[in-house]
């Protein structure tokens, strides 16, 4: 003790204090250095994530594009990411991140499914048929067949290309970009091989719809009674997540731990290729799984014989007493700032504020990238891991959207084609190829034609989720859309639709649409009589939580069925589709983008052709727009090549459309109700596209065709649907109703091309409400529509005008009191000005030239379009009496009578028509053509 004390005497005491102080200083310095490194790492993490946001989370060229997959046949669907059962399973797998990582380290079986492996080279869907991939043929399933879920189903739900910020690489047709050789892995008997994969998705209302969740369960030998979870992936569609400090630490730690175990874990997985666009992972990989089937005990869990409990929200019965309301007060007006792009294809790069419910979007700038919050168990973004030996539920991170910036950011249109199981590359009609009916089946095909007025036999042979070629113009994939696009309700109305055609329509929407944008799919059954569209359809669609069926208790027709769907829709945008369509890749976002930029825009896809005879998918010519000819017959008209060249119009440019086809379009729900929806006085079908088109354009809206949105449609020469009344009379009645409300003075032009419409005296119902609605909306005139929207439509108000000259005498018809006389021609005299109208009246103001057949003379009478005693044939008589083309003929008498001039007496009279009599030939000063 004395020896120690001497060190603290005198100078030794000073040295001791200096030593102690040095040690303490060193400790503080090391602590400060550690804190500094932590701050630097956090800063680098923030910069890296912000940089990725600015660069759009681009997929590098060496990263993967994937093989599309699908089911074949029409059996009950597998319980995929859209399935109800798997939607619920995510809630049962909750465990903290630390526990998950400890199990990874303990078992030594961890693998980063999206880790750093060599990527498969890019390839294109159009070249699938050239790839040497062997997939076992599947037996065509009927509506009541037992579904067989293959083992590869677990991953194939997400074998899709999510090109959020990467231009798709496309080679010339027929030239594959790469060869993908299929192989089958075999498991070691000592190794625990995965037997079953079940895909499930989180349906929590708080979960972000901007992302996609996939939970993969690996079930081992039943004797061991172990359920193992491989991974849970969160595919990001837009902005990066907010990573918390503890989460970042655990992720990086797990990556390091799994790096050495990757090779061993890979042996347990057979062949399968997929990709996910992970914002915080720099590399992507392929995972491999074996093609096979579920064991019988697992397959039985999804057998169609299982009793299904249909919720009240799945099937809604609408009775006759439930009146279809169209009160605009039901949907509040959207108080938003409307911006009209200056150019037709205006740049969508500006942020347009929108006061409506939006899909959640991750903020691009991370103000709290390193937070102290603990990780939570919810559908979030994390690295994909696999634990093949222990029951380890997946984990994620709850994103906070409290501080969403004003500019939500943009991304490239997603190229999504999600399917439930691998596609049979050799299936009939795959990739939109034509199919030929075998000779021995031609009679059966002919007999079934009447079921849908197209080749129903071939439709049933073709997979309900077949692949079709991406027919979008080059450059569409490079276009940007906003991250916070509005949600949409898909409304499909049908009556006695062909089973396979209806299923193919629904599958194409589910497979090729970003799920976070689909609020629901409403199938409105307009009182179908087919048995398979009742319980069988309910059973099939119950597999998809977002599909609801509305059943009308009596036949209402397409128009009122759509109104029923609109009333039950909850999405921000209504997207109407026919029930025999196939949506192509990238079809939805371009439509919603236009509505997002301007809520008064009605966006229509390019409607391509599904051949009714061989079911082939065919593209159409570019630069087409919807138009009409008199009397309001819809048709397609191509923009002339010289106009395209002169104005430098590109294939991707948006086209203003005077009239939409009416079957396929997206419209803001609140705006739809502001316009008064469809005219509820229209019956069944026909004319509704004209009515809504005129209403949109004349009341402040716009209709556009979006070339980057493509939807195939089965065009039929006739439809098989029954009408409560005569079909033609129903359509004509609707058109007359539209003309009386919207055409103003031009309705005579409409009647002139269908003069029988006046003669029939159709009861169009009460028009007061529709006319008052037009005044309330302060809609423009039809002349404005012709001048500004459809200027190339020839629409003269009258057929001929000016002075009426007798070709033999050179004298003109004139008015004197209430009589008609012949005078010297004076073009400046108002008494000699006449109009020959489209309803064949010779008008002078409110007076019309009227014959008195019994006396053989003429007089003036108040004009009445319905009075056949005032109608004359001129020029148009050439169809029946070509020799009387220059005569003015009165045909509503026992014999043909013609107007004849007598200059000596300055009178006009009626005489029997004589083609050789020059005094019976007349001409107006000016004629108009259409």
Swiss-Prot record:
Region (Catalytic subdomain B) location: 654-716
Any Pfam family matching the protein: Ricin_B_lectin
Cytoplasmic topological domain residue ranges: 1-12
Subcellular location: Golgi apparatus membrane
BP GO annotations: protein glycosylation
Membrane-crossing residue ranges in chain numbering: 13-35
Binding site for substrate: 526, 555, 579, 685, 716, 721
Chain ranges on the Lumenal side, renumbered to this chain: 36-930
Record's bilayer topology term: Single-pass type II membrane protein
InterPro entries reported for this sequence: GalNAc-T (IPR045885), Glyco_trans_2-like (IPR001173), Nucleotide-diphossugar_trans (IPR029044), Ricin_B-like_lectins (IPR035992), Ricin_B_lectin (IPR000772)
Sequence segments annotated as region (Disordered): 190-209, 327-381
Pathway: Protein modification; protein glycosylation
PROSITE patterns in the cross-refs: RICIN_B_LECTIN (PS50231)
Oligomer and partners: Interacts with EXT2. Does not interact with EXT1, EXTL1 or EXTL3.
Entry's free-text remark on domains: There are two conserved domains in the glycosyltransferase region: the N-terminal domain (domain A, also called GT1 motif), which is probably involved in manganese coordination and substrate binding and the C-terminal domain (domain B, also called Gal/GalNAc-T motif), which is probably involved in catalytic reaction and UDP-Gal binding.
Family to which the UniProt record says this protein belongs: Belongs to the glycosyltransferase 2 family. GalNAc-T subfamily.
Protein name: Polypeptide N-acetylgalactosaminyltransferase 5
Primary gene name: Galnt5
């Amino acid at each position: 003790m004395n020896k120690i004390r001497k060190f603290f005497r005198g100078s030794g005491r000073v040295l001791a204090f200096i030593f102690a102080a040095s040690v303490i200083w060193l400790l503080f310095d090391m602590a400060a250095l550690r804190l500094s490194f932590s701050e630097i790492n956090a800063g680098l993490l923030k910069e890296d994530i912000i940089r990725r946001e600015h660069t759009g989370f681009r997929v590098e060229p060496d990263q993967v594009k994937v093989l599309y997959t699908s089911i074949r046949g029409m059996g009950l669907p597998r319980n995929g990411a859209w399935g109800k059962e798997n939607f619920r399973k995510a809630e049962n797998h909750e465990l903290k991140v630390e526990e998950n990582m400890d199990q990874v380290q303990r078992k030594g079986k961890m693998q980063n499914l999206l880790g750093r492996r060599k990527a498969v080279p890019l390839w294109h869907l159009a070249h699938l048929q050239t790839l040497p991939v062997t997939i076992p043929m599947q037996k065509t399933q009927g509506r009541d067949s037992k579904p067989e879920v293959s083992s590869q189903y677990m991953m194939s739900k997400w074998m899709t290309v999510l090109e959020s910020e990467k231009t798709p690489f496309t080679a010339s047709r027929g030239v594959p970009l790469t060869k993908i050789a299929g192989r089958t892995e075999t498991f070691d008997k000592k190794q625990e091989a995965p037997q079953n994969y079940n895909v499930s998705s989180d349906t929590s209302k708080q979960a972000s719809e901007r992302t996609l969740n996939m939970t993969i369960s690996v079930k081992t030998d039943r004797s061991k009674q172990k359920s193992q979870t491989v991974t849970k992936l969160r595919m990001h569609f837009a902005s990066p997540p907010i990573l918390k400090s503890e989460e970042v630490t655990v992720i990086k730690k797990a990556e390091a731990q799994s790096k050495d175990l990757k090779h061993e874990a890979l042996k347990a997985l057979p062949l399968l290729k997929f990709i996910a666009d992970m914002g915080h992972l720099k590399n992507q990989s392929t995972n491999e799984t074996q093609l096979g089937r579920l064991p019988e005990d697992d397959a039985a869990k999804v057998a169609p014989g299982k009793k299904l409990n249909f919720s009240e929200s799945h099937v809604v019965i609408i009775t006759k007493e439930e009146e279809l309301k169209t009160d605009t007060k039901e949907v509040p007006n959207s108080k938003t700032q409307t911006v009209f792009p200056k150019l037709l294809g205006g740049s969508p790069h500006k942020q347009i504020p929108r006061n409506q419910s939006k899909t959640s979007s991750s903020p691009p700038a991370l103000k709290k990238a390193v937070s102290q919050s603990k990780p939570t168990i919810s559908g979030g973004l994390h690295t994909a891991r696999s634990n093949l030996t222990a029951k380890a539920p997946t984990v994620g991170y709850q994103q906070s959207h409290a501080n969403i910036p004003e500019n939500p950011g943009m991304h490239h249109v997603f190229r999504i084609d999600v399917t439930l199981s691998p596609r049979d590359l050799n299936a009939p009609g795959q990739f939109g190829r034509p199919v030929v009916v075998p000779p021995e089946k031609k009679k059966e095909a002919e007999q079934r034609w009447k079921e849908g007025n197209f080749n129903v036999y071939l439709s049933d042979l073709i997979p309900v989720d077949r692949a079709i070629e991406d027919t979008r113009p080059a450059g569409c994939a490079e276009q940007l859309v906003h991250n916070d696009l509005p949600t949409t309700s898909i409304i499909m109305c049908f009556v006695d639709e062909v089973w396979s055609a209806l299923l193919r329509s629904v599958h194409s929407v589910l497979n090729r649409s970003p799920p976070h944008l689909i609020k629901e799919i409403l199938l409105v059954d307009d009182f179908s009589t087919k048995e398979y569209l009742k319980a069988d359809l309910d059973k099939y669609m119950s597999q998809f939580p977002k599909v609801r069926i509305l059943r009308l208790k009596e036949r209402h027709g397409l128009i009122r069925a759509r109104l029923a769907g609109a009333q039950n829709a909850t999405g921000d945008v209504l997207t109407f589709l026919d029930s025999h369509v196939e949506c192509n890749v990238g079809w939805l976002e371009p439509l919603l983008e236009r509505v997002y930029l301007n809520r008064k825009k009605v966006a229509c896809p390019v409607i391509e052709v599904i051949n009714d005879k061989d079911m082939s998918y065919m593209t159409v010519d570019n630069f087409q727009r919807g138009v009409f000819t008199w009397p309001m017959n819809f048709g397609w008209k191509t923009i002339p090549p010289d106009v395209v060249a002169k104005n430098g119009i590109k294939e991707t440019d948006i086209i203003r459309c005077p009239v939409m086809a009416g079957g396929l379009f997206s419209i803001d729900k609140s705006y739809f109700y502001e316009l008064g929806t469809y005219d509820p006085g229209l019956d069944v079908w026909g004319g509704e596209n004209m009515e809504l088109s005129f209403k949109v354009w004349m009341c402040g809206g716009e209709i556009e065709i979006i070339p980057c949105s493509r939807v195939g449609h089965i065009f039929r020469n006739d439809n098989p649907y029954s009408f409560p009344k005569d079909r033609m009379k129903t359509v004509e009645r609707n058109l007359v109703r539209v003309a009386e409300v919207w055409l103003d003075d031009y309705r005579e032009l409409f009647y002139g091309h269908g003069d029988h419409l006046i003669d029939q005296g159709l009861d169009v119902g009460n028009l007061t409400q529709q006319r008052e609605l037009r005044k309330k909306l302060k809609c423009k005139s039809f002349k404005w529509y012709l001048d500004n929207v459809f200027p190339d439509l020839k629409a003269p108000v009258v057929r001929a005008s000016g002075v009426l000259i007798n070709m033999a005498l050179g004298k003109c018809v004139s008015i004197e009191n209430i009589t008609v006389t012949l005078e010297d021609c004076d073009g400046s005299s108002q008494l000699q000005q006449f109009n020959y109208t489209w309803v064949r009246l010779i008008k002078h103001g409110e007076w019309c030239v009227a014959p008195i057949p019994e006396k053989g003379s003429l007089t003036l009478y108040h004009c009445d379009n319905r009075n056949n005693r005032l109608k004359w044939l001129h020029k148009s008589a050439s169809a029946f009496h070509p020799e009387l083309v220059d005569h003015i003929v009165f045909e509503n008498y026992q014999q043909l009578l013609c107007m004849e001039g007598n200059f000596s007496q300055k009178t006009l009279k009626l005489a029997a028509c004589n083609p050789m009599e020059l005094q019976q030939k007349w001409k107006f000063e000016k004629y108009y053509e259409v």
